[in-house]
């Protein structure tokens, strides 16, 4: 009985088999995660591509939908807007319609769960677009950048599709094949 009592006492003092180093590192890891979450990155209105890339590089390599939403980023997950994202998107569109300079970051996830960030700013009526695929393990291009003159919204076949384009007369059918076009890029496609 005395041996059992001593064993229980020893285990309780050692943190159930964890060393002091393990306990300290677990506390440090938890604090670091909380601190990272508290570091909200301001989405600035930019038109220079090197500045946009620098801004996007500030976001962590691994981002959950919750982390992304906390950062004020529009989250598209499973063909739907994430929590609070539709409100952010609608505010961006309102600013564009009101001819106010504005910017937004959109995050969509690959099949493997890797985040792809899209930065869009509207400055003096032009759209500056940078896609950041640096977090995509299987991505071939790390950054893609374009400038566009127009945005188009299509509501058809149960989908809400937003694109940036150089062609203001682009039809819905043509917009479905934007990957092959050099004059447009799809920002988001969500189920209505």
Listing of model-derived features with the role each one plays in the protein:
Residues 1-7:
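Sec-dependent N-terminal signal peptides
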Residues 12-15:
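C-terminal motif of bacterial Sec signal peptides marking the signal peptidase cleavage site
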Residues 17-19:
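Bacterial signal peptide processing site
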Residues 23-192:
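Mature, Sec-exported extracytoplasmic domains of Gram-positive
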